[in-house]
Structures are given as structure tokens and as C-alpha cells.
């Protein structure tokens, strides 16, 4: 059966839910889809459908990143439900990288927690421009003054990480109450239930506060490979978010990073299981490649316009080292330290050759909480460029975040 074409009539925006584990991100995501489904602007998804990878069921924690799509009157949204648990920050980093804005979910009963702080920091580091806050579990809060205090604390925290804490919309509500109302009566409209109205209020805030993304559509094509699979009789598909530019069926693209750079031709493009003639910046797409075996391509490579990006092993970067409070190290580290550098979609081991202060002096020891310039050498060449964000990780946890300031080699 030929696949339906994907219609582009409204601006497309990638958003997602971030925040501390068990604060209600997945419940809110389900509530949004069910609320908008009443208007025919979404496919209703229950909590279990969003929390649907086997590992997630086993632990009751969202591990993988779930994608849902919905529309408001003004926009089409692709929404990722990011993992909340510190063990799975790896996916938070790939997930948050796919956001033009995010909904920070904070349980009013707890207020900001360590992962709330970490997710705000990560959102900053991966370049999420704007956040909207959903203050969840309002139904469990008797004390209005306490709600005000939680809100104040959140605004201060957001300002600390250079978001506009004074202006950020904070919408109060209960994802669970809205979800229960919509489950009982899936046709509930705006104005018929106060909890459902809060979901509309949140989407209004997202529509107005999160800007239409400035698409990098005129830059040369680049897509970081997140996953690879084979389609029998058709070839190998690489999936990921198109970071910039456009790609058309028939285009020649380069496969860059980890191994020797090679050319291939695009034979098909799909998005949300529908065929496209071209994919463009911001799309989460599957790209079918001619003459490439599944074994030739892996997560961490990029597809790019030939000659537009090159693989490198050495760079300088500005790094912020997380404090213990933010989930970072307790102890300092020294030149020669070998962590993993999380670049776009993958971890690459590298050595920090040197630390340099803002004054240009060599620094021997770096403490949690420091901001420092690093010189890094990676064991594998990766497609890197100035301004690119990365995370520094060890033993499965993020201990630092940075941005490439200069390519050395």
C-alpha cells in the first residue's frame, strides 16, 4: 500500500516534557493527547501506550523516548516524553536535543528536585530556547501560599540557569485529574471541566511563549543518526532528527564519523510512517540509503551534504562541571582524565589534555561547579563543528556539559 503523504499546513514545532522522575511527565503527555483528541487534533494515547518500551514496564520508569504528535489551532507538534530518571540521562540528552521548547513538569507537592535542576541545565546546554512550566498535582495542595512559594523557587532556579525566570509562564493543574475526566468522557470540550481547561491553558502558553523555531533550512543538510534498521527488499534506513538543511530523494549525501567518510544516494524519506519527497530541518525522519548495509552505519554518525562537515578528534570547549548536588562528581579531576563525550547521539571516549582558565593560565585540578576551558582528544573521529553542544559522562551519569569553542584537528 502506498503511504499517505504528510501534509504541511501549520508550522511544525518539536517539544517535550522534562522534569524529575514521578512528577507526572508521562501522565501529562497522555492528558494532552486525550484533550486535543476531542477536537480531532490528536490521536488519544493512554499512559501505558506512551510508557510502552518493555524496560519501562518492568521498572515503572520511562526509559526510552516516546514520540506523540498533535495539533493546536496554530501549530503541529511532535512531542517527546523524555526519561526522568538519572540513570537514563543519556536519553534525556538525545531527547532534549530534539526540542524547540519544553514543558518542565514540576510536582507542586515536591517542588524543584535534583533532576529538575539537572534537566533545566541540560535544556540550556542542548540549546532548548524556551521552557513553559506545568506545576502538576495542584489537586493535592491545600495551601495556596505554599504553591506561591514553589512557584517563586522555580522562577529563581530558572533565572540561575539563564532562562527568563520572571516571564516564563507557569500553569497550575493536574495531569491525572484531566486524564481521568477525558477517560470517562473523551468528548469533553474546553469550558466543560476546570482540569481539562488547565491543559488548554498550558497549550495556549506553549503556542504563544515557545517561539516558532528558526529553522536552519538554508544551511547544508545534516542529520545525526539515532537508529538504523533494514527494510527487506528496500535497503537500509537511518533515523534521526534533521538538524539543518533539506534532503530530497535522489540527493547524494556523505556518511561522516567513526569510520572513513563515504557517499551514498537517498532513495526514500519517511516521517510518521508517511512518505515525503523531501525532509527538512526539524523533521524526525527515516532516510533510505542506496548500497549501504546495516553494518556500515551506526548511531553517532551523521548524514550530511558532501563537504559540509568533517570528522575531527581534537577540539577546545567551554565546559561546566556539575556539582554533586546536580548529580555530578564529588571529587576533582586532573589533566589526563578520560571520560565519555556525548556528541549528538553517542558517547565517544576522549582524554582531556589540558584545562585552561579564563585568563589563559593552565589549571591542574578542576572541581565540581567549575566552568573551565578544556582541550580534548577523542579516540574516534566524529563530525564536530564550532558551537556544537556536548555532555561529559562517566559510568552512565552526566558530570559536565559544554560547547565546542574551537576545532584543533
From Swiss-Prot:
Coiled coil where? none
Function of the protein: GTP hydrolase that promotes the GTP-dependent binding of aminoacyl-tRNA to the A-site of ribosomes during protein biosynthesis.
Q: Where is this region: G2?
A: 60-64
Q: For the region G3, give the residue spans.
A: 81-84
- List the Gene Ontology MF annotations in alphabetical order: GTP binding; GTPase activity; translation elongation factor activity
* Gene it is expressed from: tuf
Q: What InterPro entries does UniProt report for this protein, alphabetically? A: EF-Tu_GTP-bd (IPR041709), EF-Tu_GTPase (IPR050055), EFTu-like_2 (IPR004161), EFTU_2 (IPR033720), G_TR_CS (IPR031157), P-loop_NTPase (IPR027417), Small_GTP-bd (IPR005225), T_Tr_GTP-bd_dom (IPR000795)
User: What name does this protein carry?
Assistant: Elongation factor Tu
SUPFAM superfamilies the record matches? EF-Tu/eEF-1alpha/eIF2-gamma C-terminal domain, P-loop containing nucleoside triphosphate hydrolases, Translation proteins
